[in-house]
Amino acid sequence: MRVLLKKLKQSGFKLYGLTNWSDTIYRVMEKFDIFRLLDGMVISCEEHFIKPEKEIYLRLCDKYGLKPSECLFTDDRMVNVLGAKATGMEAVLFTTTKKYIFEIERIFGIKIEQ
């Protein structure tokens, strides 16, 4: 997944995190450099909303000047995917990297070298 995120970043995609974690996320972020790939993040403990509540997805958009219709949300839980879709975001359920790459290629009409 890290390799894929790096490729997306190098291709000009902006990457944002949206998590239901508590403030312990900051200790995790210090340990794993994958978080440095993100252009921003919304953490539920700071926003007082959690996925799949509509407000947290919209907070991400408001905070970073994004339009829901121009966002692709990815999660490994269908309930969160449906929450994102309810805001107008395109959303994909993550099951495997291979399937995820297929979905990105389909949605954006691009080819990602594997």
Residue ranges and their predicted role:
Residues 1, 25-28:
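Short low-complexity stretches enriched in small and charged residues
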Residues 1-16, 54:
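Short, acidic loop-to-helix structural element flanking the phosphoryl-transfer center
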Residues 6, 22, 29-114:
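Asp-based, Mg2+/Mn2+-dependent phosphohydrolase catalytic module
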Residues 19:
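Conserved phosphate-coupling serine/threonine residues in phosphotransfer and NTP-handling enzymes
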